């Protein structure tokens, strides 16, 4: 007997799947495609995507979706995160969290932190998909952080089910009086540089959404030249290249029909190299030489190498060359040239006003403009100081970082500027600059353990209020990226030292007694792990197995009752 006609209550894609194959060609597939386009256009017009710019159309997305309908739990978590961010941003209050490295830390954070953060640095140094740990140079396999996301998302689900089961055994009165812990906290994950070209970004974004990440941040460093944001040697990519990455992630999630949040991060506050000079938006910050007598650095180094110079000799020469050579922007070279020719300050100010009005003026137009004020051409060459890898020197700083944040803003849900030190005034200036152009746009702040917080002159009150002070300036999402790693190291260091001399006295004093005092549920780790929950499942499947239940008679955790 033939199957009944598909129900009209099903999503269009599901109804299409239930049609006989002979009926799928033609009108039915056209109807599904048109329904998809309409649904996408309405979705993009919702408050969720207010202010978000896309360089592609709803038809572009619909044609890439295929005929299946998927729902991803990470999209629900993304909506949960978006709503929380909007609520806190409106109040000028923070969502502050700590990086977690395992399910234990996730469960201990859940009652107190509203989101969960997973750091690429931590994954690189603690748990990669090849188990080859190393510094945060972004060179671990691209599924490393998505795997950790999946690990913690599954742990969240397990502890949610365990709690649900426990609460169903309570009376209604007991349930109403027993606090509910939301284990299903939105996960924010580190996407590094996207781990390759745009097709790699697409695949990475898909993996993150499938594995449970509500939001992912992507930074504007070069894949292959990536360093931790608090290390030297960072190489930036052109502004437009990073915008393409953000759009690739957004496109992938649009195809999936998921609302995951795109976080744009810039390392241009401290990144002193850039891979290309192709983008005019970067030209005002690219450094060069204004002295025609200076020989090209890369050519000189290659000549030294060809003559048999040692690596140490080349390194010494390069460091000396960079230190002794004055690197300037074109505008600085132009102003110095004008002063040398005796051009009046009024004319110099006229030139600077013109470049300030059009900060995206490219190098060719800047040369043409400068020629209107000088008798001879301005000598400026940004190829001379290029590194052996071909990178250009870049004027890092908050001015460059602010400009990049503004450029990324239309394509991102949140903005993150990696900074070199914790400073309320600097953060406030950045927040105001961004939000004056993008009202309501939330920012991310890394409360980094790479900062020596004790050496920055904070009073106890200032240290305590720092998070809330910058939240008022739009830094809604704040995180100690490596708190989980450092807290594990600290307690293990203390216990290891004391256990060596004091034996079990040390374990009781440092761990077990503290677990009981704090109400830490890992004190009874069998129960914490879900042994009672699994016993319940096995008991439902098979009767008469009470003697083999893990939490039955003989379970030593009864000693803690």
From Swiss-Prot:
Recorded hits in InterPro entries, A to Z, give: ICL/PEPM, Isocitrate_lyase, Isocitrate_lyase_ph_CS, Pyrv/PenolPyrv_kinase-like_dom, Pyrv_kinase-like_dom_sf
Give a GO biological-process term: propionate catabolic process, 2-methylcitrate cycle
The ranges of region (Disordered) come to: 154-177
Assigned EC number: 4.1.3.30
Tell me which cofactor or cofactors this protein depends on.
Answer: Mg(2+)
The entry lists its GO molecular-function terms as: isocitrate lyase activity; methylisocitrate lyase activity
Q: Where is the composition biased (Basic and acidic residues)?
A: 157-177
Q: Would you tell me the Gene Ontology cellular component terms?
A: mitochondrial matrix
Disruption-associated phenotype: Abolishes growth and conidial germination when propionate is the sole carbon source. Reduces growth rate and numbers of germinating conidia on butyrate, ethanol, citrate and Tween 20. Also leads to delayed conidial pigmentation when grown on non-fermentable carbon compounds as the sole carbon source. Results in decreased tolerance to osmotic stress, shows reduced in vitro antagonism against Botryotinia fuckeliana, and delays root colonization.
Alphabetized PROSITE patterns for the sequence:
ISOCITRATE_LYASE
Per the entry, what this protein does is: Component of the methylcitrate cycle that catalyzes the formation of pyruvate and succinate from 2-methylisocitrate during the metabolism of endogenous propionyl-CoA. Plays an important role for growth and development, but also in antagonism, root colonization and induction of defense responses in plants.
The protein's name is 2-methylisocitrate lyase, mitochondrial
Q: Which organism is it from?
A: Hypocrea atroviridis (strain ATCC 20476 / IMI 206040)
Q: What is the lineage of its organism?
A: Eukaryota, Fungi, Dikarya, Ascomycota, Pezizomycotina
């Amino acid at each position: 007997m033939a199957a009944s006609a598909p129900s009209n209550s099903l999503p269009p894609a599901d109804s299409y799947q239930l049609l006989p194959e002979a009926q799928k060609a033609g009108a039915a597939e056209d109807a599904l495609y048109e329904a998809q386009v309409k649904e996408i256009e309405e979705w993009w017009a919702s408050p969720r995507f207010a202010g978000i710019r896309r360089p592609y159309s709803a038809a572009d997305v619909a044609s890439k979706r295929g005929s299946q309908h998927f729902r991803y739990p990470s999209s629900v978590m993304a909506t949960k995160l978006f709503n929380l961010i909007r609520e806190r941003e409106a109040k000028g209050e923070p969502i502050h969290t700590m990086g977690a490295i395992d399910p234990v830390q996730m469960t201990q954070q859940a009652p107190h932190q509203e989101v969960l953060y997973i750091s690429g640095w931590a994954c690189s140094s603690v748990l990669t998909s090849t188990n080859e740990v190393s510094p945060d140079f972004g060179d671990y396999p691209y599924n490393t952080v998505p795997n950790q996301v999946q690990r913690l998302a599954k742990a969240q689900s397990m502890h949610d089910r365990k709690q649900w089961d426990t609460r169903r055994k309570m009376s209604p009165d007991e349930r109403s009086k027993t606090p509910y812990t939301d284990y299903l906290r939105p996960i924010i994950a580190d996407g590094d540089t996207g781990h390759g070209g745009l097709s790699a970004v697409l695949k990475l974004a898909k993996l993150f959404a499938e594995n449970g990440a509500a939001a992912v941040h992507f930074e504007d460093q070069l894949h292959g030249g990536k360093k931790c944001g608090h290390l030297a040697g960072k190489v930036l990519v052109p502004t437009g290249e990073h915008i393409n990455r953000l759009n690739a992630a957004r496109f992938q999630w649009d195809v999936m029909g998921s609302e995951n949040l795109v976080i744009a991060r810039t390392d241009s506050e401290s990144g002193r190299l850039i891979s290309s000079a192709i983008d005019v938006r970067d030209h005002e910050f690219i450094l060069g030489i204004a002295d025609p007598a200076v020989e090209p650095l890369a050519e000189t180094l290659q000549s030294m190498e060809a003559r048999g110079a040692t690596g140490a000799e080349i390194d010494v020469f390069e460091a000396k060359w960079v230190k002794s050579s004055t690197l300037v922007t074109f505008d600085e070279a132009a102003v110095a040239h004008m002063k040398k020719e005796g051009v009046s300050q009024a004319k110099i100010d006229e030139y600077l006003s013109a470049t300030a009005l059009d900060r995206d003026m490219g190098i060719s137009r800047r040369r043409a403009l400068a020629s209107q004020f000088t008798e001879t051409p301005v000598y400026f060459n940004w190829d001379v100081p290029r590194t052996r890898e071909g990178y250009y020197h870049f004027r890092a700083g908050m001015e460059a970082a602010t400009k990049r944040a503004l450029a990324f803003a239309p394509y991102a849900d949140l903005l993150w500027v990696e900074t070199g030190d914790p400073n309320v005034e600097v953060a406030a200036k950045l927040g105001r600059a961004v939000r004056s152009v993008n009202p309501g746009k939330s920012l991310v702040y890394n409360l980094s353990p790479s900062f020596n917080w004790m050496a920055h002159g904070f009073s106890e009150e200032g240290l305590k209020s720092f998070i809330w002070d910058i939240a008022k300036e739009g830094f809604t999402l704040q995180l100690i990226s490596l708190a989980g790693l450092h807290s594990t190291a600290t307690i293990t260091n203390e216990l290891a030292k004391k256990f060596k001399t004091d034996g079990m006295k040390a374990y009781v004093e440092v761990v077990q007694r503290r677990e009981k005092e704090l109400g830490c549920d890992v004190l009874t780790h069998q129960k914490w792990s879900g042994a009672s929950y699994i016993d319940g499942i096995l008991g439902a499947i098979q009767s008469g197995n009470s003697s083999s239940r893990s939490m039955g008679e003989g379970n030593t955790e009864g000693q803690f009752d």
